[in-house]
Amino acid sequence: MSGSLSRKTERQRRARTEAISARLLAREFFNRDPREVGRELLGKIIVRTERSKLLAGRVVEVEAYLGAGDAAAHAAAGRTQRNHVLFGPPGHAYVYFIYGVHYCLNISCMPEGEAGCVLIRALEPLTGVPEMARARDLNPLDPTSVRDLRKLLSGPGKLCEALGITRMRD
């Protein structure tokens, strides 16, 4: 009985994986105002493969940064070596290190030459939860360690740590 159950579970996981990785967003999706992109990113799924394991989460929280006119944006003071990705083609990852501790994942928006981005603040874990928990030094077998799945990827630093996103992805 457990053998058939595990085969069924594996088939369901495989079907979900295929559905998750079925459609990539075109770069044109990001070639517009970050506020629009941010609203439409909610509910989309971010997929990453780490050591041949599929990791996926649904976008549940974002922040839009408008570039030169936005004092909180990294691009507010213009192009630098650090933020040059924001001024490039839309749809690229802009990853930065903050407080000497955390990485943050942004996606560039706006036409090339203009800066804007959407910060991915939180994801709802979908696939690869044990791997994501281990990447955050949590024990996936300990119910108290991953008691609330919403907290596993709740925050830009947590989701980057869980998905293995660093400046190497910038």
Predicted regions and their residues:
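Conserved, well-structured core segments that form or line functional sites
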Residues: 2-170
